[in-house]
Amino acid sequence: MWSLTYLIANICGSIVISVLGYAGEVVTPTWVIAVSALVLWSPFIGVLLWTSKRHGSGNFVKDFSLSFQATDLWGVPLGIISQLLLVVVVTLPFQWLFPSIFNSEAVEKRANDLFDAAHGAWIVLLVVIVVICAPVVEELVYRAFIQHNLGVAYGARIAVLISSFWFAAVHLQIAEFPGLFAFALVLGICFARTKRLGLSIVTHVAFNATALVVMALTR
């Protein structure tokens, strides 16, 4: 069911971009990205809501462990270190072995494109999408739903590995895969250890925020 949801969501997202006339464009406006993201995420949230009502308690927050504690603030330095150090260290061997694929330009292309498309007040919308919405939705999907259910079936370690691989793969950028997989392992371990989404969400927020700050400072 989840694979079908993913397929439908991506088809809908692609249709929206095409209808708006930005298919194949090098730089897509931030408002188009926002609309596309909303369409892309809606089927996932819909399935989570349905799952909570059909197979859970009906309490969305409880069913998907969406709670926070003060200790989750450790996710801030963890996310920053993951962005500035972990991703770089993990990607470096691939850059040495396959420089034409894993060069810095390719690894940073998505972040650069997003930042280049945002001007003036649109930067605020970009921050909302990348720093707030994306981490919450992705942690609900990949940790609270996919990893949790895989853990029930195959155990925590296998669940972390598979959900992390899936997380990195669905971003559809081979140059980003090593770094995203390593970061997803961090997020998966956070969720497995705490049994809550708080730490993984805060870590993810800090990770994405750091990427935007780096983009801004290097312009």
What does each model-identified segment do?
Residues 46, 96, 138-139:
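A generic alpha-helix propensity feature with a strong bias for hydrophobic helices
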